[in-house]
From Swiss-Prot:
Signal peptide: none annotated. The lineage of its organism: Eukaryota, Fungi, Dikarya, Ascomycota, Taphrinomycotina. It is a multi-pass membrane protein. The chain crosses the membrane at residues 16-36, 54-74, 80-100. This is Uncharacterized membrane protein C688.16. The keyword tRNA processing does not apply.
Amino acid sequence: MSCLNLHVPKNPVGKYIPLVVLLQMYIIYVEPYYGLHYFESVRQFLGPKILYGTVYFLVICHSIESAIAFLLCLKKGLPFCSSMKWIVSTFIFGGPTLAMLNKQKKHIA
């Protein structure tokens, strides 16, 4: 079961960032599809290009950070399960997890 535990940044604010991203995804994709209008003013104020652009930008940035985490795991010689935890955690939380991985010593899972 230890293979399923993710490496979470120690910064408590970093734990809530995925919730903000999920709220943004809800505002962009789910709410208009079901005809709900709770966040209509936010969509009108920011516009669809900015909302879609930030999602695409974040996905690209986190993908690049995950690729860097993959290379760091290869360089450190970490086992597959531990490497996958670091890569998924870096994709979700971004830079703070990548900084934690960079500080880890060689062969530490």
